[in-house]
């Protein structure tokens, strides 16, 4: 074994050495580790690791083998049994190593050598691997740093570019601003110089004026001295003349004496005693003369007395009717005027007219021709209570009328005098008067019912308290007038057949003499029982409730007729209704505060609970609290808090009072005794807690207490059981005075109320504060309970201790249904509280408009007399819808509306101070409202009002007069002016009483200026949103100076003129319904009315007129419908009147040219109109204006060719020879007084007609430049303003969208037609002027558009397309083939479909479903374009090389293979896109993105021109054009084209020399025609002319050099700079469009 092991071991150990050593040496020789890559190093590492693992295995195997060999070698030959062998072993082991020889060829040495070598190799490899890994890490770090640096470099470069761009932009802006500032500085300097020059001139003028004043002063002093001298001379002369007169008089007396002596001597000689009669006769005549004078002076005195007494309503003729009226008045019941009364009447005569004038100023004119109709319930208002004008006040007269019946017996034949104007006396007597007489009587009765009686009869009624301190000045006169008119009107009254009056007790003592009134059913049919505590539902309108009687005076006891109960099915007794005493202490009221006392508020107990399973706390509170207008106050034992709820703005103070209730436990209280008070009727307290339940059911005490519990709880079963018991007092009241009926009514338990009423409970039982069950139900809003209580004759006018009636409480809490029921029952609206408040005060104090309207209008007739409405009503009815209040008269008198409380505040004061504008509006509708009534602090309602209420009060009696602009009468068929309107309403003038004539003039001027600027603005802006300058003219040139005259109604007026009356009085007196402004027209030699009628700017019309006057020969040409004929005729009219004003006779001659109009006819026209005169004849003084219309129907060169020279030079130096009918020829010439105007309905001239162009002055009316460009927009805007009566609607209004759509259709149609190369189909704005403007009916506009499309647009487009597609275009020829081919028909249908969908239906304001319904009405609405696509692809083979070379746009390629269909037009955002030529011809911005599409289409057009010149098929061109319109995806929305008009770009192609121009802001410059046609000499001339006329501001054409992205913004800024438009530049664009496209995307 040793031999085997020895022989094998060297071989085994050599193999790993060779395996490990050979690769190491090879690696040294073949490659270097430093040059290896990362992947190679990794592979080498993996190989080495495999080698190491293999060597480890070998080492382990060798170690095991070594152990075996060692043991074999050392111990193999010994035996343990042999000791000597053991000794030998130990010996050998103990010997030194050097001495020992290897037993065999020692494999350990070999193994150790191998291991040492491997260890060395492993260490070297590990060092090399570590070095390689470190180098790799370093390389990775360097790569990352390099990438970061590159990114940072890119960012910095981009930032640098941005900063450069920004800096350039800033520099450009700064340069621009510097230029602007320098320009402004120059302007300011120039202005300063002008101002300084003006100042110097003013100084010179001032000094000159001072010198003149000094001279005038000297002259005046001299003249004064001269006057003094002359006066002294006159005095001297006068004294001399007086002395002479005295001498003459003395001489005359001497002569008279001598004459008398001579007469006496003669008479003595003739007769003896005849001298005495002759002496007495002069004395008698003298006496008679004196008597006549005294009669003349006494007569008017007598008449004036009678007039003041009896004839106030007939002030126009006071002297004629005196003798008749004085004796008749006493017979009618008026007391005769005694001597003392006469004196009083005469003394008060001076106050009559002021009183009448004051009434007129408030709308209460006495001398009204058509009296207003009062409502029938006017009688019912007053008869329930006393009239304040004739009976004592409720609160101020404790002892009024101690006996009422006895005085009445003495006056049974006639009513007492004071009752003639008292509603209490007259209302029951004549309840069904003629409405006109009733209205007139109502005016006199209601205007001031507080006036004391002045008829001298003081036994009928004591003097009343005067509520109005400001109405004492005219009491006497108004009282006399009221008596007189009321007496006269009472003759015409008679009792009516229907509707008997409600029984009442007037003060005259006619008690119980009225017929009974039937009462209908009071239960609401089908009315469900309302849960306790919940607000009852609103019932249907009652068929009619009875009118229960009420005492007119609190002291009277009225005995009702028992026949009332017999006519009804409801239990009623003949009771004596006693009202509460009226002598109550007057309470103090602070403004906006209420002093609440215990005596002025009833106590309403909460509902007790008997159900043990229901938690009682707040069982009825939440619903009640939320259903009321005001909130009931929270209660404390000793403090009563006032109402302060969400809906009430009252902030009253609180007043502590002694409480009679001790809030201990529920068992210690009596049921029904509550601390819930009806505090000034303000509402229910949300924090009420039922007193009978504090954690458990209330103990059932005595039967009366249990009865109240059941009534408050609404337990009908228990209540009915208790009522069936005998001996139970159902009227028992607790210590607060609350009965069971009170508790049931307060909590709204209708069934309980009915049970108690059927059990004969006292319906008017009041608590200790005087509140009845009706008061509680009305305050809580339980209208069914109110209805029941009224049916059982509850006192509807019962006043509590504080004076609160059920109506007052219902109004205070805004319970409409309760108010309606009470008013229908005839409650008194005029009862005042202790503080002097009426129900109207209560309704206004809470801001409840519905309650106020019910109080004022309920019971009024449905429709009043519209002709006789008060002036205040007319204002509000202008702005409000038709409603009951607006068409009927209020039923409350003016005294009640103007009644002031203890502080002097009226309802208007309260509404104005709290900002309740709606309530104030309702009050202002009452004609008798006195807004100037002052309170005790001398403040009016306006003084205490909020801002919006102040505005309302200022406009109270304002008149709204429409202001209209008139342009005079427009002749029918006036040359395209059929759609023009004569008058337009621009606004409504608000004329107040205090408006002066200066303010009126300024308002008219400002309204005109605002209107002119509004209709000429760009957007839909309201007049309030725009800040106008009243001195600047509008963009159309009109201003206030354009006005010719103004008429106020039918009265002429000029700005600045003043009348004696104020504008308000003047408008009312003259019944002026409108103010009409007439603009200056051609009759005055002005064109303002023409500007307003046609919306052509005034400056342009004046420029046209100047051209006519300067050049004498002007032709207006443009597309059909451009108003050429109208412009020419109006200019001729203006020129005619100017010449006539200068003293020259003038005549206008019109001639319509047709195809048969020959040159001979034109010669005859010129000769007959004396425009062409023989050379031998001298020109006449007469001016001749000739208008040749429709020149497009004839050849200009043939018609006017022989007249070109003579027309250009109006003198004998340019004669022309014409043959007459007899064969003789004669020379003629055009004289200087001849003007020639022509009209051509054609967009451009062609062929031989261009020869005529240079001999005339041409005015081109282009559709895409002014005046035609903005004419339609201004015209339709004015139409909308007129339709909305002067108001500009908001831009989102459907009418504005419809008008904008019609405007966009016109522009888009012309853009598409221009792109298709069919200028003869272009349309002027005339056809679109008739666009209907109907608010809310956009369908009408779409129908009108369909008719216009079918009748005008589609036939013109069809003719133009066939004209282009049939033959090669020749100038002047527009012929069409009679039988178009199928391809031509397809092209026409495709063109119509594309135009319809891209230009007409695009942007339609209708919804998609509605639009689809109307699409069928349009001719050519649905046509599939697959034919176009196939046709286009087939014709692709015939394209020339140049076409394929240039037409490389990707949008052309993508469009060639698309086949969209237009059966249902796609109007979505990604559907239809506008085409580029639209953008070319319609107002685009010159951005680089648009430059691309411009170049594409320019290349298209240029190559189209090349193909035409090569004789290619025009159908293919049209198909290409149409398809590019369909498939253009890169263009902006077509609806945005019409938004800007500053940058118009057009392209012109004339022959082989195309001109690319962009006209910027040049509305008047004619440009070359947009037409693709072969080159001709005439077109070359035209092109050169147009090229010279275009502005220098053409777009800069883009270079063919590549453009980086960062310069796009810079290029867009430079596009407005001028550059040349040479041919080479154009070719560069076309050839390099492909290079530009990548930079555009």
From Swiss-Prot:
Residues 119-276 form a coiled coil. It comes from the Eukaryota. Residues 1612-1626 have a biased composition (Low complexity). SUPFAM superfamilies: Ankyrin repeat. Residues 1-27, 361-433, 446-472, 488-588, 1442-1468, 1544-1641 are annotated as: Disordered. PROSITE patterns: ANK_REP_REGION (PS50297), ANK_REPEAT (PS50088). InterPro entries: Ankyrin_rpt (IPR002110), Ankyrin_rpt-contain_sf (IPR036770), Cortactin-Actin_Reg (IPR050719), Cortactin-binding_p2_N (IPR019131). It is found in: Cytoplasm, Cell cortex; Cell projection, Dendritic spine. Residues 385-405, 576-586, 1551-1562, 1570-1579 have a biased composition (Polar residues). Residues 1580-1590 have a biased composition (Basic and acidic residues). Keywords: ANK repeat, Cell projection, Coiled coil, Cytoplasm, Methylation, Phosphoprotein, Repeat, Synapse. One of its GO terms (cellular component) is actin cytoskeleton. The modification Asymmetric dimethylarginine is found at residue 491. GO terms for molecular function: protein phosphatase 2A binding. Residues 497-506 have a biased composition (Pro residues). ANK repeats lie at residues 702-732, 736-765, 769-798, 802-831, 835-864, 903-933. The modification Phosphoserine is found at residue 1512. Interacts with CTTN/cortactin SH3 domain. Interacts with STRN, STRN4/zinedin and MOB4/phocein; this interactions mediate the association with the STRIPAK core complex and may regulate dendritic spine distribution of the STRIPAK complex in hippocampal neurons. Activation of glutamate receptors weakens the interaction with STRN and STRN4. Regulates the dendritic spine distribution of CTTN/cortactin in hippocampal neurons, and thus controls dendritic spinogenesis and dendritic spine maintenance. Associates with the striatin-interacting phosphatase and kinase (STRIPAK) core complex to regulate dendritic spine distribution of the STRIPAK complex in hippocampal neurons. This is Cortactin-binding protein 2. It comes from Ovis aries (Sheep). The lineage of its organism: Eukaryota, Metazoa, Chordata, Craniata, Vertebrata.
